[in-house]
Amino acid sequence: MEIFAIIFAEFSYLSYFYIVKVNTLPQYPTPTNGSNRTNMNRTETERIVFVDYIRVVACFLVMLVHASENFYGADASGLAGNTSMLLNESNRFWVAFYDGTVARTCVPLFMVVSAFLLVPMKEGMTMHGFYRRRFLRILPPFIAFQLLYTFLPVLWGGWSWQEAVESLKVIAFNFSPMAGHLWFMFPLISLYLIIPVVSPWLEKSTAREERTFIALFACSTLLPWLHEFVLDEVWGECFWNGFHMLWYCSGYLGYLVLAHYIRKHLHWSRQKRMKVGTLCFLAGASFTGWAFWWRGEPGVVLETPHLEWSWEFCTPNVLLATFGAFLLFSCIESKTCPAWVSRISRLSFGMYLMHMFFLSAIASWMVGGNAAEPLLPVALAIPCIALLSYLCCLVTTQLLSYLPGSKWIIGA
């Protein structure tokens, strides 16, 4: 308990420093025309190049995460479910490295990018106009793939027609049992729902006010650690109240405000963004990988939430790594990007939606039923599974994009 008291005290001091002292950090002067010297402001006619690079890389990182899951699953599917087991030290290290250190920022990066581009809303945009525009883009492909993941596995014996029909009852309320990765769509939808509500505040908020909210959000990311090591219920949680003290400052809303703060108020030089970004990413990512390695024990079945105690996307380490990664990407100040980067960026949503169709088959072939001795050494097997899946998805979405009405299937 003493160590957590020390951690909390240090975290409180850092929050104070972040709120009060950060104004003294050197910033770019605001030019007389009101635009930032960095290229992070939105314009109607110019794409933000580094955002395209984030989409391209983050999409691959998602597949790297799911490729890694094939090497610590304890159930018949081979994927990490409610329980996990590492078969040897090699799996322990490389899963921690790829899934934890390298790829854990993938989901928060997508959230930050969404908020970075959409907040605050364009002048004159109404709530219903915003909802119509965003949901017409994401809901038809989402629903289409919910149905595809439900019925296509019947064709290759993944499950029976009866099981597929039963799963229809599930997808009315949640993601398909065959498509666990579609959980991401629900927090993305919730983020879109809240944007018109917080957008007016963000238009008027000062840098210090946004830092205050971000500091509260940072404190809320301690919750998974408190649940794991201190108490199951903290900050007012109990069986009749599931909303803790910082509930309304927590979750992906924090990444939304962070994205707006970076775009509007953080006018650091490229050199400073490079230095701070590198330090933050290395510190956060290293801890994320180490925490999995430390908790994992080869040959022992563990409850997955306990094994992944530091991997939740709203934890201090992942927040720190995401902030660092975003700063590093923002150092890409080119006005244009290669056509292939722009193209993959546009196709990335469809690639994400379909990737488990390919990844499951490729992983099954690569692992061969024995995660301890895959076709290639684990150090190579995990990135190879991810890369092959990525290429298959890229080719498929590119071909589908030529079809009339493809935007209703792949969003592009």
Per-range role (PLM):
Residues 296-404:
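Alpha-helical transmembrane segments of multi-pass integral membrane proteins
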Residues 64, 216-228, 281-294, 357:
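Aromatic-anchored segments of alpha-helical transmembrane domains
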Residues 70-78, 154-161, 229-232, 292-300, ...:
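Membrane-helix interface motif
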Residues 210-220, 275-284, 345-348:
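Central hydrophobic cores of alpha-helical transmembrane segments
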Residues 62-65, 111-117, 146, 254, ...:
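Helical transmembrane-bundle signal
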Residues 95-108, 172-187, 228-255, 288-323:
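Interfacial loop-to-helix transition and helix-capping segments at the boundaries
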